[in-house]
Amino acid sequence: MSQQLIGSEYTVYRSGDGNGGFTPTTVKVPTLGPHDILVCITHSGVCHTDITFCQMGAPIALGHEGVGIVEAVGSLVTQFNVGDRAGGGFHRDACGHCKYCLSGRDIYCYNRVIFGEGDFDNGTFGKYYIGKETYLHKIPEGLASEHAAPLQCAGATVYAALKATVTPEKRVGILGIGGLGHLAIQYANKMGADVVIYSTSTSKEAEARQLGAKEFHLLDNMFDDVKAPIDVLVICGTKYPDWDRVMTKEFLARVGVIVPLAAPVHGPLSLPAGAMFFQGYHVFSSLVGSRNVHDEMLEFSARHGIKPMVQIFKHDGAKTIREVFELVKMNKMRYRAVLEMGD
């Protein structure tokens, strides 16, 4: 690592200003550990989770969907070279030897470090991000950095859930076409499933079909024209449906799976117990993807031409981040915001 980089200052944007916002904070590039990598961020996705942590008031360096160029590597790094593209920012470390790590589920390691649970001085809204070699991911050729950035959280979240629940013969219902939903359409379609969309607006129908949807229904009449039961229902919107009507064998096939990805996380998930028991329904939760699934997601995306629809904002400091946050909170983003760093 160049000695000129050690101690050089840059700005991170730290939540916890006491008013639901964030504060620009100056930090210094540390001496890298043997397995650390210094990434000069070129693009960072903006996720609603960043806004949530601002509202919670915890002092966390914001940003967890970063892509950039490797600028320096620790002495024992073997998987990356200076000049490589790397992505990451949500899942940052794990013990490597527990039953979760050894079975490819390191995201659930009891000693994990993820965005918001540790490493509070390190975020992807700043110029630099310091990542562990094993928790950064090479960006495949053919996947532009502005498209790869949102995949570091949103893409991994959706892909991991669908990989665990979807097979080619399934009918997959996706409720909500937003930052997660428009990716879910693409992944489920390329996995061979028949994709059924439930949305609040007919204005999104043409777009949904272009992304790979076979059927489109408005939420208000989602139970009125059921051609066949769906096998998997992925919740990508901010509100739950009427569970009493969802959990019938006419709408959700027996042994069907409910996947809540973007539902209200602070409220209860109340489901009719009788339907759960007698129809064999399951609930499957997903928190991004472990390392192997994350890498697979990036390769799958590049191979099948899957990319998020993004709005790019030239990163001009705190004012740009505040502008993007407001657009996200007003549900005016279509569909993922990306900060593009300056020189």
Task: Indicate where each model-derived feature is located.
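Residues in the short beta-alpha loop(s) of Rossmann-like NAD(P)-binding domains
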Residues: S201, P264, G289
